[in-house]
């Protein structure tokens, strides 16, 4: 006995009707389009308080390796950092689309000097976040800059930020600060962890 099902659904067209769209730029991470491959992840939003677009870098495999710490502070996933796209002009508006069929985010940032189109994705089998841009003449000189995050436990950082002494681990030893360098024309960020990894 065999059973089968045949569908004439145009899946690309069907999926495009499910795409999420933003008619204004997301103002924070929880409004942003998220992309990922199960390990590597990213989101895109306007950086709060700055004239810049944030492309976050995250990876669930980046975590602390403190075996002498059985608490939730010793093995937590660590923040990596983010890129900021700094336009030439002042950001006035923008739009984004999370394309489900192609697993990518596309959009346009409009400024007082022109526009920057972008297309971003997280590759499915490799740990890469790809961002392609195309700028009008007035925005050709926009820049990218990487900003590393603090490599301490996010729980510890959150307790410090909120001034919550009940959740502050008193004997927590901070990881060294990230080191930025350049080699062979590539910009690098080295994040050393006390317990390795």
Sequence positions of predicted segments:
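Hydrophobic h-region of N-terminal signal peptides that target proteins for export
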Residues: 1-5
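Aromatic-residue-lined binding/catalytic grooves and analogous aromatic/hydrophobic interfacial grooves
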Residues: 6-197
């Amino acid at each position: 006995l065999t059973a089968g099902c045949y569908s004439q659904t145009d899946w690309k067209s069907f999926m495009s009707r499910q795409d999420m769209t933003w008619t204004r730029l997301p103002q924070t991470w929880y409004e942003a389009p998220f992309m990922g491959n199960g390990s590597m992840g990213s989101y895109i939003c306007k950086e709060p308080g700055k004239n810049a677009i944030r492309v976050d870098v995250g990876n669930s495999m980046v975590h602390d390796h403190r075996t002498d710490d059985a608490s939730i502070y010793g093995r937590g996933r660590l923040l990596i950092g983010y890129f900021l796209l700094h336009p030439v002009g002042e950001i006035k508006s923008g739009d984004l689309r999370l394309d489900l069929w192609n697993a990518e985010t596309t959009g346009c940032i409009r400024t007082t000097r022109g526009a920057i189109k972008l297309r971003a994705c997280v590759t499915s089998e490799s740990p890469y976040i790809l961002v392609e841009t195309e700028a009008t003449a007035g925005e050709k000189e926009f820049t990218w800059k990487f900003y590393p995050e603090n490599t301490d436990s996010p729980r510890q950082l959150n307790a410090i930020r909120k001034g919550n002494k009940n959740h502050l681990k008193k004997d927590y030893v901070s990881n060294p600060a990230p080191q930025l360098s350049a080699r062979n024309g590539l910009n690098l960020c080295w994040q050393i962890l006390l317990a390795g990894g």
